[in-house]
């Protein structure tokens, strides 16, 4: 049986008019379950429903709640921005990420040699209280020592 015969057989099985097989070869629908009409109407129906819902919601709330859109967008943004900058540039987190100026070029050979440099500038990592279990563990002889070389983005993720 060739591939073509196989697919012809499948196509015959899926031919419209045989029960309620909704998947036909042309992607249409069978006579028993005409889905296509309802799908065509869906976007309009959804939009109407959304509008109705929003109207009911607005009527329940006081009129000042939904102010003009431009004013709320203008008011909300400046309060949100400085917090992000603060989190990004806290000095404890900035220190480990600073590397040689060539670190951006991203050559693999360089990254292997740079591991020693980054390890020497990691005392803040070992002093942190959350990771004390890594350094002071009784079963340290059972497990191989943990290497500090993680992803390049690792220091940024530890917030």
UniProtKB/Swiss-Prot annotation:
Q: Which domain of life, per UniProt? A: Viruses
Q: What is this protein called?
A: Uncharacterized ORF3 protein
Q: List compositional bias (Basic residues) regions by residue number.
A: 77-86, 146-159
Locate the region Disordered: 1-159
């Amino acid at each position: 049986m060739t591939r073509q015969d196989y697919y012809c057989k499948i196509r015959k099985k899926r031919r419209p008019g045989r029960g309620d097989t909704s998947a036909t070869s042309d992607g249409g629908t069978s006579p028993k379950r005409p889905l296509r009409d309802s799908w065509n109407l869906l976007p309009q129906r959804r939009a109407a429903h959304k509008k109705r819902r929003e109207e009911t919601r607005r009527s329940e709330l006081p009129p000042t709640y939904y102010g003009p859109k431009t004013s709320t967008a203008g008011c909300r943004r400046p309060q949100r921005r400085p917090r992000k900058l603060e989190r990004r540039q806290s000095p404890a987190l900035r220190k480990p990420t600073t590397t040689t100026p060539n670190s951006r070029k991203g050559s693999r050979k360089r990254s292997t040699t740079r591991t020693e440099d980054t390890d020497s500038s990691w005392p803040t990592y070992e002093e942190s209280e959350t990771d004390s279990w890594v350094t002071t563990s009784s079963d340290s002889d059972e497990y191989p020592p943990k290497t500090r070389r993680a992803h390049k983005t690792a220091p940024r993720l530890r917030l």
